[in-house]
Amino acid sequence: MSSLNVTERFRIRSLSIERLRRQALTLAVSSPLLRWRYAGNGTDQILIVPQELRAADPSFWSEIAHGHFGLASEIADLKGASPFRAEPPSLAWARKLHGFGWLRHLAATEDEDAAAAARAFVLEWIALRRLAHGVAYEPEVVGRRLISWIAQANMLLEDLDARSYTAIMQSIGQQIVTLKTTWRNAPDGIPRITCLIALVLADLAVSGHDRQLKEAQVALVEELKRQILNDGGHVSRSASVLADLVLDLLPLGQCFHSRGRKAPEEISVAVKKSLSFLRFMRLGNGMLARFNGVSTGSPATLATVLGYSGGNFEVMAAAPTSGYARLERGQTIVIADVGSPPPLEIATEAQAGALSFEMTSRRSLIFANGGFPGPADHDWDAVARATASHNTLCLAETSSSHLVRHMQLEAMVGGLPIRGPDAVVSEQVDEAGQAVLHATHDGYLKRFGLLHSRRLKLSPAGDRLEGVDVLEPPKGKLRLKQDLPYAIHFHLHPDCRCTESGRGTCRIKVSDGQVWIFSAESAALSIEESLFFVDSAGPRPGLQVVIRGTTFGETEVRWTMHAEQLDVTA
């Protein structure tokens, strides 16, 4: 951690002023003088029900029946108590509980007992939540709850007596008003978009609220244009947030058509760009590459999302605005991080993985970054975010990015953001059918006076990856006062096996039978322990190949990964 520079101090001051402005505006529109304008006309009714596109797990109902409530990778043992009275295992669990996204699992059972339980849960929540405060009334949680209740309205409102029906509809109406007055206080990024999607959906789906539709629609369009970059990536540089965004935006677009209204073009544009970027970031095993907050995920869910893009598509070769590069030859895919961290206010899950890469061959993941831990494993966050947990060079046991420790900033953004490298430049070329990437970052320049450059070259058949890592000053010659240790990490997926097969060489056996040989020229190579943080059961031990050495100011390390046993036509 290091002191803040003038630019960062100015940025924090600007964020503080913007936060105060949003809070003042929220306070103003929440006053009795203005709050009335957000109320509906008469008794609220559900006019349309959006399609639920997220996958559902009917077994969730049987778990509840046995007293277990599993959310956000944690399970609460209810012991006969209400989940709303139970002690939350974590803040993430509480947010999921009050967001009610889990209602879709009960709906998927098509069981009347499960449907009755869903209605009872909602009515109990209404009875217990008389005061609008706490986790349940964080803007993003309110937004997710509105989306969930409206999407499951057919189940929730079926066979209700007049009193219960009125209670649910009045609660929906009150929550719409609450969100319309508080959404500006949502954290920047996807939470703010979620709030606005919920408001637009509510204005379309609930009677009497459509007079504010234009206002919410304009705000949503502005956020989509600001947050979705030209190449389809999200401003946070996390690919995983886009899958959920698409699953919210697609039904929203359908709701416009159901109401006989034209959906804003920006919604379909955001969906198309997001789908294109998700295809770009998907490896051969069907999963997203693990950079900047990408955690556990389901290949089936991603495949479902990408299915909405149709069959005619061409995967981009690069995503320069988002800061990623993709090399693909034969059945081998390499995706590399060639970007700087996102803005401070949305960098709390960004990782120090400059010039790191992941690699799949056929459907097997070989080189994998540590990834971002799930909600139940946040104790590992700092380790997972460090450069040493990525497939790249780490100089003097120091990460290429730094955590920014500032109490006011942490309070505003909800965590520790990172900063640096300031400059990352890259170029992709084709050399006689070989996919080649050149990239350089300055994450070590201020502390050590050195740049880290990396060259990756993937053969036309995809059976050979050559790499060159270089440490050098930006110009001229440099002799350090003392030699600095470096380590180039190559983390293997836990399913891979690795054994030394000679000096500077090791043999990697992949789970599907492939065998690859990794070798390094004139450098010490070792096989060491590693951790894969994104396994659904928690951090999983594995192995990594590490090239270690020291630099006096200028160093070049060459390494090669080639297939010993690989049928590239399989």
Regions found by a protein language model. Name each.
Residues M1-K79:
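Extreme N-terminal leader/anchor segments
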Residues S62-A65, A318-G323, A352-G353, A432, ...:
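A short, compositionally biased
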Residues L78, A336-D337, A368-N369, I508, ...:
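Short capping micro-motif at the N-terminus of alpha-helices
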Residues T194, A350-A354, A388-H390:
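Short, solvent-exposed loop/turn segments at the edges of secondary structure
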Residues S2-S3, R85, G143, G189, ...:
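CBM-like, beta-strand-rich accessory domains located in the C-terminal region of large
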Residues A198, L229-F372:
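Carbohydrate-active enzyme catalytic cores, enriched for enzymes
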Residues L78, S90-V271:
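Aromatic-lined, polymer-binding surfaces characteristic
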